[in-house]
Amino acid sequence: MSRFFRRRKFCRFTAEGVKQIDYKDLETLKAYISETGKIVPSRITGTKAKYQRQLATAVKRARYLALLPYTDSHE
């Protein structure tokens, strides 16, 4: 018996019926990036493998076009 209620992971893209993840949709992409700028793994977010691959490609494209940072701001 666990002490804490763990929320069930689910794929947000499957639930919403998304066909393709857009690299220009920065609000969606920022939800899957840590504060240090790394892509959060699917075992933590619950994203299916198909959408995790699309997500990684979209984040890399957005980084290349300077829409997202590669790392956090070093202060």
From Swiss-Prot:
Q: Which Gene Ontology CC terms are recorded? A: cytosolic small ribosomal subunit
Pfam families on file: Ribosomal_S18 (PF01084)
Q: Which UniProt keywords apply?
A: Ribonucleoprotein, Ribosomal protein, RNA-binding, rRNA-binding
**GO molecular-function annotation terms?**
small ribosomal subunit rRNA binding; structural constituent of ribosome
Q: Where is the signal peptide?
A: none
Work out whether the entry's keyword set contains Protein biosynthesis.
no
Which pairs of positions does the record mark as disulfide bonds?
none
Task: Check the record and name the PROSITE patterns matching this protein.
Answer: RIBOSOMAL_S18
| GO biological process: one example | translation
Matches recorded under SUPFAM superfamilies: Ribosomal protein S18 (SSF46911)
Q: Which InterPro entries match?
A: Ribosomal_bS18 (IPR001648), Ribosomal_bS18_CS (IPR018275), Ribosomal_bS18_sf (IPR036870)
Matches recorded under PANTHER family: 30S RIBOSOMAL PROTEIN S18 (PTHR13479), SMALL RIBOSOMAL SUBUNIT PROTEIN BS18M (PTHR13479:SF40)
Q: What does this protein do?
A: Binds as a heterodimer with protein bS6 to the central domain of the 16S rRNA, where it helps stabilize the platform of the 30S subunit.
Subunit-level organization: Part of the 30S ribosomal subunit. Forms a tight heterodimer with protein bS6.
- Name the protein family: Belongs to the bacterial ribosomal protein bS18 family.
NCBIfam families from the UniProt entry: S18 (TIGR00165)
Identification of the protein by name: Small ribosomal subunit protein bS18
